[in-house]
From Swiss-Prot:
Keywords: FAD, Flavoprotein, Glycoprotein, Monooxygenase, Oxidoreductase, Signal. Disulfide bonds: none annotated. Its cofactor is FAD. The keyword Signal applies. Glycans are attached at N92, N147, N159, N170, N231. FAD binds at E35, A46, R119, D326, G339. This is FAD-dependent monooxygenase nscC. Its EC number is 1.-.-.-. InterPro entries: FAD-bd, FAD/NAD-bd_sf. Belongs to the paxM FAD-dependent monooxygenase family. PANTHER family: FAD-DEPENDENT MONOOXYGENASE APTC (PTHR47178:SF4), MONOOXYGENASE, FAD-BINDING (PTHR47178). It comes from Arthroderma gypseum (strain ATCC MYA-4604 / CBS 118893) (Microsporum gypseum).
Length: 412
């Protein structure tokens, strides 16, 4: 019983942090989640959950049915939708269907999930409420495995057995214990816009192209313009768009990595002019244009990835620090697998901790960390490389897309 009095300190209330907390709590292991932001923090955009991610989570939560997840997180859940996506790619200058995966099974293998709803659903999957403390921005960590302290900017201090760094791509924990591991900036332009439509307008402008899919992906000549449903009700639809492309040679006015947060919310004139010159087809032309931008919330996103060597991960583990989520395997959002691996991290780490604490060994925290990294390191780091490669492939020249479409037609 003495082991179970130890508290695990989790830094970050994102998908990885909450998954770990929920599973530890369900297994009777005390833990506290610390989040720098306030409870009203919003990340309402949608992500794609793949079968390898959601099935592992559902199993860990007690073999919950997929329908439970869908009813809780699908962007179109309110109207009876399932978060389905067609995984098709269309030419955003003609509307022509370029790539459409052949459906070999009726089973839904990808579920679109509203990020806010997913965090809440995970937090609610247990009898005991999670202990999440907002407004706690980490300042530093002290100590070692088994006796480690987290010190916060609000002067609060908490002692625990282990610190789980779930604090994202710009991890404060990582920057302190592994200062040489820094995010790598991907040379791509990425702007993200949020807007709302009435159901009538949505059915008129987007539904003819998207059908029941929760995302409509448009690809062009080295640039992409996906439209995605974030939340849908009977009367309104909250959507977002992305505009991403490769960096141009010379002085690219839109390539501005490391912008301050307030500056990233401003719409540069160069973006307005560029979108106005794209000559997009419907429905993209209705939203990615200079006039529409005036009523949209627009953000500049810097695309980063994080790689971590196994030696670095183990070194931090010896100090009582273990990483989950984007803090050690950040990858591109579009075409990436980050959310899925965040779920796997939470499941695998909690399993390792539960198993180690049930053993009679003295150095059980180190055993738990070593067990977790024995499989999670290779899995996650390979995913970063795979996702980054896929991100560039999705920004290929228009001629390549046409060639792919033509080959597809010949073989069908």
């Amino acid at each position: 019983m003495a082991k179970q009095q130890r508290t695990v300190l989790i830094i970050g209330a994102g998908i990885a942090g909450l998954t770990t907390s929920r599973l530890l709590t369900n297994n009777g292991i005390p833990n506290i989640v610390f989040e720098a932001s306030t409870p009203d923090r919003s990340q309402g955009f949608a992500i794609s959950l793949q079968e390898f991610g959601y099935s592992t989570l559902l199993s860990a939560l007690g073999d919950l049915p997929l329908s439970s997840l869908i009813k809780g997180v699908a962007p179109d859940r309110v109207i009876g939708g399932t978060g389905w996506i067609d995984q098709a790619l269309r030419d955003n200058r003609t509307g022509e269907l370029l790539v459409a995966p052949e459906l070999t099974t009726t089973k839904q293998t990808v579920v679109r999930a509203n990020r806010n709803a997913l965090r809440q659903w995970i937090a609610d999957c247990g009898d005991e409420e999670l202990d999440v403390r907002y407004g706690h921005k980490l300042q530093r960590v002290e100590g070692k495995a088994g006796n480690i302290t987290a010190v916060f900017e609000n002067k609060a201090k908490y002692n625990g057995s282990l610190i789980i760094a779930a604090d994202g791509v710009n991890s404060t924990v990582r920057s302190q214990v592994l200062p040489s591991v820094v995010p790598e900036t991907i040379p791509l332009i990425h702007y993200h816009g949020e807007f709302q439509l009435s159901r009538t307008k949505f059915d008129e402008l987007i539904r003819p192209y998207s059908g029941h899919s929760n995302i409509l992906v448009g690809v062009g000549d080295r640039f992409n313009t996906p439209l995605s449903i974030c939340n849908m009700s009977k009367s309104h639809v909250h959507l977002d768009w992305s505009y991403s492309r490769t960096v141009k040679e010379g002085n690219d006015l839109l390539y501005r990595p490391n912008l301050p947060s307030e500056e990233a919310k401003k719409i540069p004139l160069a973006l307005v002019e560029e979108l106005g010159a794209l000559d997009l087809a419907g429905p993209w032309k209705h939203f990615l244009n200079p006039e529409s931008l005036k009523s949209h919330r627009v953000f500049h996103w810097t695309t980063r990835c994080v790689y971590m060597t196994q030696d670095d991960a183990r070194s931090a583990g010896e100090k009582g620090i273990v990483f989950v989520g984007d803090s050690w395997h950040a990858m591109p959002i579009f075409g990436g697998e980050g959310g899925n691996h965040a779920l796997l991290d939470g499941v695998e780490l909690s399993n390792a901790i539960v198993t180690a604490m049930a053993s009679t060994e003295k150095d059980y925290w180190s055993k738990a960390v070593a067990s977790y990294y024995s499989s999670a390191w290779k899995r996650s780091q390979e995913a970063v490389r795979r996702s980054t490669q896929r991100f560039f492939l999705l920004h290929r020249p228009a001629a390549d897309w046409r060639e792919i479409a033509e080959k597809k037609r010949r073989t069908t």
